[in-house]
Structures are given as structure tokens and as C-alpha cells.
Curated annotation (Swiss-Prot):
InterPro entries reported in the protein's UniProt record: DUF520, UPF0234-like_C, UPF0234_N, YajQ-like_sf
Keyword Signal: no
Superkingdom, natural source: Bacteria
Entry keyword set: Nucleotide-binding
Source species of the chain: Thioalkalivibrio sulfidiphilus (strain HL-EbGR7)
HAMAP family in the record: YajQ (MF_00632)
Protein name, per record: Nucleotide-binding protein Tgr7_1196
Molecular function, one GO term: nucleotide binding
Keyword Nucleotide-binding: yes
Lineage: Bacteria, Pseudomonadati, Pseudomonadota, Gammaproteobacteria, Chromatiales
Length: 160
């Protein structure tokens, strides 16, 4: 029986490249000369630094631009609140990867409400969709693309 997986993944190599490009642009831009503007990548967190709130926002804008250019969905970034103190500002941005249980349940519910002849099962941080016909699976993909689940979704491991 044909099946595919619904996942939410981020290509870490592309993310690292986008962060490096952002840091390179910060280093060369005239309006950032002599400031504490910087960006760091630790595991699944980005930390943006600046002298003031507007600088952190500018770093965020540059990052979003570079990430979009590299083909990563900007929806995978979850900005935290801005922390200011001691003449410096910083913001921690979480990188979302993997489908949480609540979101997975929402996806399964959406598929079941569509009354298509497919089964959806939660398997860890992904949702496996199985059906008898390939056309049904393609309808599920179209349905999920239209639905807003709060995460960028990818479809992989398509088996016939």
C-alpha cells in the first residue's frame, strides 16, 4: 500500500550557511561598525545580539532574508522575547523541528475529517499516512498544504 511521512525538518547545513552569511553581512555593514551586533547558532537555538532593540531587529531581518534565500521556511523560527540590560539587547530564536504530539493530533484529525480513504498514524515526531490509492495520498498532501497547522511541513518517504 502506498504511504508517505509528514515531517517538519530544517536542513541544519543550510541554516548554518544562512547564519554565516548573516554574520558576514553584519561584519561588513557600515551601520554595524563598532557595535555588539552578532548572531550565534547553538544546536536548535539562535541568539541575536545588539546594542539596542532596533539593531537586534535589523539582525533578525537580515537572518530572515538569508534563510528565505536558502530555501528554508521562515515559519520554523520562533522568536523569543527581547531582553535588554546593561546597554545591550539580545533575543533567543528557537528553531522548530519535529512535529509535537498536539500538532500531530491536529493533522490526524484534519485527515480523518476529510473522509478520505487513508489512515494516519503518529510515529514519534512524524505522521505516517497510508492509503490504497496514490491519488488519495496526493489529495491529503493538497489538503495539508491548504491547512494552517502552525509549522512548515514537508512530505517524504513516499512509497508505492
Amino acid at each position: 500500500m502506498p504511504s508517505f511521512d509528514v515531517v517538519s525538518e530544517v536542513d541544519m547545513q543550510e541554516l548554518r550557511n544562512a547564519v554565516d552569511q548573516t554574520q558576514r553581512e553584519i561584519d561588513t555593514r557600515y551601520d554595524f561598525k563598532g557595535t555588539a551586533a552578532a548572531i550565534e547558532l547553538n544546536e536548535m537555538e539562535l541568539t541575536l545580539f545588539g546594542d539596542a532593540e532596533f539593531q537586534v531587529e535589523q539582525v533578525m531581518d537580515i537572518l530572515v532574508q538569508k534563510i528565505a534565500k536558502r530555501g528554508i521556511d521562515v515559519g520554523c523560527l520562533e522568536p523569543g522575547k527581547l531582553e535588554e540590560g546593561g546597554g545591550k539587547a539580545r533575543r533567543v530564536v528557537k528553531v522548530l523541528a519535529g512535529i509535537e504530539t498536539d500538532t500531530a493530533r491536529k493533522i490526524v484529525k484534519l485527515i480523518k475529517e476529510a473522509k478520505l480513504k487513508v489512515q494516519a498514524a503518529i510515529q514519534g515526531d512524524k505522521v505516517r499516512v497510508t492509503g490504497k490509492k496514490r491519488d488519495d495520498l496526493q489529495e491529503v498532501i493538497a489538503l495539508l498544504r491548504q491547512a494552517d497547522v502552525g509549522l512548515p511541513l514537508q512530505y517524504n518517504n513516499f512509497r508505492d
